[in-house]
Amino acid sequence: MSDRITVEGRDGAFGAYIARPKILRAPGVVVLHEVFGVNADIRKHCDELATQGFVAVAPDLFWHQEPGVDLSVTSESDWQHGLRLNQAYDRDAGAKDVKDTANAVAKLPECSSEVAVMGYCLGGLMTFLTAARYGIDAGVAYHGGDTEKYLGEVGGLNAPLLMHLAEEDEFISKAAQAEIKAALAKKPNATVYSYPGQRHAFSRNNGAHYNAAAATLANGRTRQFLYQQLRSAERTSSKVQV
């Protein structure tokens, strides 16, 4: 079941999409969008997580600039719109919004209080930043652009972190990927997977670079990671068809 909720953050209230599993008192996952806002792809990711036994919530990261952004990945004008929003995005304020969302999800009556954060592209970066700055129960980052610029904060990373990188990512150079891998290799709680031959957003549903085999592999690793790191997830998953 999907719906909209309002998150009361420290800097104001903002909207979020929520997908609930059939079995409640389930662990939560905060799903962070790309530069396209809470669009059809992000909502589909939330819906899929709900079928796997998670309370999935996608906050509107761009609410400070333009609430309710919902852009198409196939429209050039929407691409340019999203890139402009991304360039003006306040990542420091955004990390606070993500943490506030995680706190709000943990308090939902349908949530078991355990909450992971998972993001794509911009959302992948924000997953890393939130984990390093504020702490979360677990994090999953898909091809987080500009992560290499914040590796000086890796010392604050104590939560389990799973990161997926596309080896041929046109937005994350091979040199940047090497820096990310080297920095996270020092953290026993961090795992980085690389996907040979894959380009940016290979797991985006119906995206130009979507690769079914790589996406299935990455998403399977993510699901297993979430089941392992969120203690109540295993109990919930035993009652849910995955």
Regions found by a protein language model. Name each.
Residues 1-242:
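N-terminal cap/leader regions of alpha/beta-hydrolase-fold enzymes
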